[in-house]
Regions:
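Metalloprotease/metallohydrolase-associated module, dominated by Zn2+-dependent proteases
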Residues: 206-310
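Auxiliary, metal-adjacent structural segments of Zn-dependent hydrolase domains
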Residues: 27, 84-150
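C-terminal motif of bacterial Sec signal peptides marking the signal peptidase cleavage site
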Residues: 17-21
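Second-shell loop/turn segments in exported
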Residues: 72-80, 152, 164-172, 176, ...
């Protein structure tokens, strides 16, 4: 979900001083009242240095920084052990996907990846009933929520059922994180090099700009959208079409097409071809090759030990 958030904070320092006397011999304390101590780097920090900072110039922030969160929501810090797990998963299911696609060349992902990934332990719940799983700020920072729900012992990424509940067990890494990561990365790429305006006309007049949250994914398919969120507006429609296609197996994608019916399927396929052409002509990315890498890695994720950094 691409929600631009600008957070400004003002800090007002107030001091009340009572002067009861002054002695010329009193010395001012030369020490600053502000702590200059820095947090000592642990094993995880050193791992992040080698796996995120040096190769990609990404700051992976797992510690809770109050100023980095939206003050309109009550959220909690990410669990330390689960932060290590998501760091390994982001590397395996996102960064290395594009490295595989580029035959090991990290230039592409290093150039366009967001510079900050911030983890939050809980989700953000909006007043209209939607849940914020991830946000991106102008392509520079990605916030990932709900980290504390990760199952360390059963890593699972669903690729076959687009209508499986994200709250169903085992915890679905694709539904909760990596669909969103690919969605937000699509926004970064289209904001760098825009997609053809013709896409905006495919579902013109059919978007649910104010009530998309009430549109179910199955209902959306019949209207020519891959998800309820895609029905909100054309930029989200484009990114959702991309991220849904590349994170679903052919069988999973076919379930959406079958649900859509003849009219809805024709619209969805028209959008898919527009997305496919954009990535091919603009970025030299074969959508089906990217998808095959994502599906392969999604099925391999069950073999990852999330309790160690090895």
């Amino acid at each position: 979900m691409n929600k631009l958030k600008y957070l400004g904070m003002g800090l007002l320092l107030m001091a009340a001083t009572t002067f009861t006397g002054c002695n010329e011999e009193d010395d001012l304390n030369p020490n600053s009242i502000f702590s200059e101590e820095t947090t000592e780097k642990n094993e995880f920090d050193l791992w992040l240095l080698e796996n995120y900072v040096k190769p990609y110039n990404i700051s992976f922030q797992y510690r809770y920084f109050d100023k980095e969160t939206d003050q309109n929501y009550n959220v909690i810090p990410a669990d330390f052990e689960k932060s290590k797990a998501i760091a390994k998963l982001v590397q395996f299911l996102w960064l290395d996907v594009y490295n595989d696609l580029m035959d090991g060349d990290k230039t592409f992902i290093k150039t366009y990846t967001p510079r900050v990934i911030q983890l939050i332990g809980s989700y953000q719940y909006n007043s209209q009933g939607s849940i914020v799983m991830g946000t991106a700020e102008q392509g520079m920072k990605v916030m990932l929520y709900g980290i504390n729900d990760i199952d360390l012992d059963v890593p699972y990424a669903n690729v076959d059922d687009p209508y499986r509940s994200q709250f169903e067990k085992p915890f679905d890494l694709n539904a909760n994180y990596f669909h969103t990561m690919h969605h937000e990365f699509c926004h970064v790429l289209t904001q760098t090099k825009d997609y053809p305006k013709d896409f905006q006309t495919i579902s013109a007049g059919a978007y649910h700009s104010t009530d998309w949250v009430n549109v179910t994914d199955k209902q959306a398919a019949k209207e020519g959208f891959v998800s309820g969120y895609a029905s909100g507006e054309y930029n989200e429609d484009f990114a959702e079409t991309f991220s849904t296609y590349v994170t679903l197996s052919p069988a999973g994608w076919q379930k959406i097409i079958d649900q859509a019916g003849e009219e809805g399927a024709a619209i969805i396929n028209q959008k898919l071809e527009a997305v496919r052409e954009y990535f091919s002509s603009t970025w030299n990315i074969d959508l089906d090759e990217l998808r095959s890498i994502i599906i392969r890695r999604s099925t391999e994720v069950e073999n990852i030990d999330l309790r160690t950094l090895n």
